[in-house]
Curated annotation (Swiss-Prot):
It is an enzyme of class 2 (transferase). It comes from Rickettsia typhi (strain ATCC VR-144 / Wilmington). The lineage of its organism: Bacteria, Pseudomonadati, Pseudomonadota, Alphaproteobacteria, Rickettsiales. PROSITE patterns: PEP_ENZYMES_2, PEP_ENZYMES_PHOS_SITE. It catalyses: pyruvate + phosphate + ATP = phosphoenolpyruvate + AMP + diphosphate + H(+). Keywords: ATP-binding, Kinase, Magnesium, Metal-binding, Nucleotide-binding, Phosphoprotein, Transferase. Phosphorylation of Thr-458 in the dark inactivates the enzyme. Dephosphorylation upon light stimulation reactivates the enzyme. It comes from the Bacteria. ATP binds at residue 97. This is Pyruvate, phosphate dikinase. Gene3D superfamilies: 1.20.80.30, ATP-grasp fold, A domain, ATP-grasp fold, B domain, Phosphoenolpyruvate-binding domains, Phosphohistidine domain, Pyruvate Phosphate Dikinase, domain 2. Its cofactor is Mg(2+). Homodimer.
Length: 880
């Protein structure tokens, strides 16, 4: 077995900062600080290999470990001049702390003051001449060891402690006497014996059980949950750091604290932190005492109270930041005016702080632009783009679903798009539905937020909400709607229409009432770092957009064009939907043509508005894609209105609706199949697009950059047929306007057969755009709207590593994309490549698209900054 113990301290170290995999984050930091000659308590690190051995061998330690541990303690005794378990003078007490390879603050266990018993306590009191301190350290040990190692409920210790304080009429911890501490310690001992039938006095037995407790804590519930939330592997294991105790609770010249080298909230370049005099580290964390600031304008700061120590701490903080080239989170203890650094690690920070610090460090010539970009978590930019809930206050959620679209919104509950429109004039509304359909678009548009009982992260509600930049929570299976009573039920809570709720689309939480919100900010530094990203990345970022508002937001966030304009979204405008329904239900070609002719000028104006905003940036328009049933009326009132407008009996409307019913419409009469079977629809759309281009050119001198895209191709014959129809319309309009139209023609690759047949298809088009939503659905045979019913179980059982509709499945779907690119390029070397599914805004998937040499990705407007950073990071990683 490899070496299990590495030393660090005043005499140098066996390790260094590069050894995080075996020493853990904390151990590697201690080793590095030792090499930098910084004042740290002497100690040693037990490697992560012990943790992995422990779990592979039924929670047993290696046979040779006890000897190696004994040698390490002996070496520590020689270094410190103290004896572990000494009952005569100067005893060595230890801290035992976990240390994962990835920082997991507070998730695993720590034991302080280890090695204590009655005799050691007396020896400690004699050696330092401070019995109160010795008893306080013993009391802390019994509590921490009891709750952490022996699993005695921690509140029982707190109850004993508080009971004695009340009986003695003492309210401040600083007023506790020796006599009272002795009584508390006696009761703590009795509690140990009550739960474990013994009081463990042997320091070596304490040490072994503490080591095992830290190892067990690797798989405690909170650590498991934290790793899942942060995608940390179970296989890393934890190291264990054992150090001599240094005491911040020796009196007024001793203290403990935490300092950040810059503000973790804003990134401001000044020390930020807190400390407590006469305390140990857990006192700051527990909140039992109010800490004081490191820097302040009053006499309560460390700068004022301990100026010499403050100067030393400032120098060390600067040295550590310049050494690690990143903001540091530093824990320290002061023992009788002597400063010790207990730990340093890269500090966690808000998104705005991360950006500000990265920009500052480039300007200070500490790091490069590439390093600055790699410091930014792309997903954290959601904090800058959306309103969010202020969780600094304690809040209790009534339910939780899937975080489908980030941001927070407060409003009154409404259960229909009609009520949303009606009430939105005077109130902010939250639209609550079982699920949404394209028919709900007007209600979604006016709503401040959307909540659905069903659906997943790529359901209709989620996709549309992300495109609109609206908060959305989906798949809230612990909620139910009673449509007749118009109520939302969350356990025992009944929410009526008009009641106020708050939803958090970033966490999936739902709250009753109005919650405190934080407004988004987008600073000059944010703009600058995004500009750096564009300088570096080779993958362009476009937007999925079909309205002027979408386009304006996209340009604001740096989109280099529109990569997907879903033309059918324009049909859901209240002025157009009746005409669309007329066109679909029309019993003959003449009536259909009549409805289309009425739609033509409306569509023309829509496209003109979009081209006008985008100027000469590329606009990729997808011809009508969804099945026609999505446009059809569902309410009796709408059916009657349609019958009246067509001058047809209501019974015929019902017959037509029944005739158009499909068992599985998403794999039925949609996409290019509509264009082939009902060619007049695509012909109208193409005429509207080209007329818009011509009128802008002639009347406003605006040149458009059109890309025309055919959806749901599976067969090259489909492309050939539609291509012939498209160019027939183009030729007719060129003759009409005496104008030569210039555009590129492409297709979606969103079916496995299209990917496999891409060699033939590529000969007929200028570009492919991978529609990864449908490609994932058809590769897996899973509906993205129904995956929420089993996805949690698949993730729990590790059948899926992640949601395949959020992070691209490289092994299956990715392989089809590789095949399509290879075969497509073999017959058309100039073939352009893009991706426009939800994956196009996912950083992990963007790295794959970069590797595949795509020209662009196209995502929801509010994902554009995230995609820009992710695209740059993909390029940087490739070059490193």
């Amino acid at each position: 077995m490899n070496k299990l113990i590495y030393y660090f301290g005043n005499n140098g170290s066996d390790g260094n900062a590069s050894m995080k995999n075996i020493l853990g984050n904390k151990g590697a930091g201690l080793a590095e600080m030792s090499n930098l000659k910084l004042p740290i308590p002497n100690g040693f690190t037990i490697t992560t290999e012990l943790c992995n051995y422990f779990y592979k061998h039924n929670n047993n330690l290696p046979k040779n470990f006890q000897n190696e541990l004994q040698q390490a303690i002996t070496k520590l005794e020689i270094t410190t001049g103290k004896i572990f378990g000494s009952t005569t003078s100067n005893p060595l007490l230890l801290s035992v702390r976990s240390g994962s390879t990835v920082s997991m603050p507070g998730m695993m266990d720590t034991i302080l003051n280890l090695g204590m018993n009655n005799e050691v306590c007396n020896a400690l009191a004699d050696s330092c001449g401070n019995k109160l301190f010795a008893l306080d350290s013993y009391r802390r040990f019994l509590e921490m060891y009891g709750s952490t190692v022996l699993s005695i409920p921690s509140d029982l210790f707190e109850q004993i402690y508080e009971k004695h304080k009340v009986q003695a009429d003492i309210y401040k911890d600083s007023d506790i006497t020796v006599e009272l501490l002795e009584k508390i310690i006696d009761d703590f001992k009795r509690l140990h014996i009550k739960y474990t039938k013994q009081l463990i006095k042997d320091p070596y037995e304490q040490l072994e059980s503490a080591i095992k407790a830290v190892l067990y804590s690797w798989k405690n519930n909170r650590a498991i949950v934290y790793r899942k939330l942060n995608n940390i592997s179970e296989d890393f294991g934890t190291a264990i750091n054992i150090q001599e105790m240094v005491f911040g609770n020796l009196g007024k010249t001793s203290a403990t604290g935490v300092v950040f080298t810059r503000s973790p909230s804003t990134g401001e370049k000044k020390l930020f932190g807190e400390f407590l005099i006469n305390a140990q580290g857990e006192d700051i964390v527990s909140g039992t005492r109010t800490p004081m600031p490191i820097i302040a304008n009053d006499s309560n700061s460390m700068q004022a109270m301990m100026p010499e120590v403050f100067t030393k701490l400032s120098q060390i903080a600067k040295k550590l930041e310049e050494h690690y080239l990143d903001m540091q989170d530093i824990e320290f203890t002061i023992e009788n005016n002597k400063l010790y650094i207990l730990q340093t690690r890269t500090a966690k920070r808000t998104a705005i702080a991360a950006i500000n610090i990265a920009v500052q460090m480039v300007e200070e010539k500490l790091i490069s632009k590439e390093q600055a970009l790699m410091r930014i978590d792309p997903e954290s930019l959601n904090q800058l783009l959306h309103t969010r809930i202020d969780y600094s206050k304690k809040l209790t959620a009534i339910a939780e679903g899937l975080p489908a679209s980030p941001g927070a919104a407060t409003g009154i509950v409404v259960f229909s798009p009609y009520d949303a429109e009606k009430l939105s004039h005077h109130h902010k509304v939250i639209l609550v539905r079982h699920d949404t359909s394209p028919e709900d678009i007007n209600g979604m548009h006016v709503a401040s937020g959307i909540l659905t009982i069903r659906g997943g992260m790529t359901s209709h509600a989620a996709v549309v909400a992300r495109g609109m930049g609206k908060p959305c929570v989906c798949g809230t299976n612990n909620l139910s709607i009673d449509e007749q009573k118009q109520i939302l039920i969350a356990g025992d809570i009944v929410i009526k229409q008009g009641d106020i709720i708050t939803i958090d689309g970033g966490s999936g939480k739902i709250f009753l009432g109005e919650m405190p919100l934080i407004q988004p900010t987008f600073s000059e530094e944010s703009t600058l770092i995004l500009d750096w990203a564009d300088e570096i990345s080779s993958l362009k970022v476009r937007a999925n957009a079909e309205t002027v508002n979408d386009a304006l937001v996209s340009i604001k966030f740096g989109a280099q064009g529109i990569g997907l304009c879903r033309s059918e979204h324009m049909f859901f405008d209240k002025n157009k939907i009746p005409l669309v329904r007329e066109m679909i239900i029309a019993p003959d070609i003449e009536r259909r043509q009549c409805a289309l002719q009425k739609l033509l000028p409306l569509q023309t104006e829509d496209f003109k508005a979009l081209f006008r905003v985008m100027k000469n940036k590329p606009v990729n328009i997808r011809l009508l894609d969804p099945p026609l049933h999505e446009f059809l009326p569902t309410t009796d009132e709408d059916k009657k209105n349609l019958a009246h407008s067509l001058n047809l009996p209501l019974s015929m409307i019902h017959q037509r609706l029944h005739a158009m019913h499909e068992v599985n419409p998403m794999l039925g009469h949609r996409g290019c199949r509509l264009g082939i079977c009902l060619p007049e629809i695509y012909q109208m759309q193409i005429e509207a697009i080209l007329t818009a281009i011509f009128e802008l050119h002639k009347k406003e001198h605006i040149e458009s950059n059109l890309e025309l895209m055919i959806p749901l191709i599976s067969n090259v014959a489909e492309i050939k047929k539609l291509k012939m129809d498209i160019y027939a319309v183009v030729k007719k309009l060129e003759q009409r306007y005496s104008y030569k139209f210039s555009f590129t023609l492409g297709t979606m690759i969103e079916l496995p057969r299209a990917a496999l047949g891409s060699k033939k298809i590529a000969k007929e088009v200028d570009y492919f755009s991978f529609g990864t939503n449908d490609l994932t659905q058809t590769t897996y045979g899973i509906s993205r709207d129904d995956i929420a019913s089993f996805l949690p179980y698949y993730l729990e059982e590790k059948i899926f590593e992640s949601d395949p509709f959020t992070t691209l499945d490289e092994e299956g779907v990715g392989e089809l994309i590789k095949i399509a690119i290879k075969r497509g390029k073999s017959s058309n070397a100039n073939l352009k490549l893009g991706a426009c599914g939800e994956h196009a805004g996912n950083p992990t998937s963007i790295a794959f698209f970069h590797k595949m040499n795509l020209n662009y990705v196209s995502c929801s407007p509010y994902r554009i900054p995230i995609a820009r950073i992710a695209a740059a990071q993909a390029k940087i990683k490739q070059g490193s």
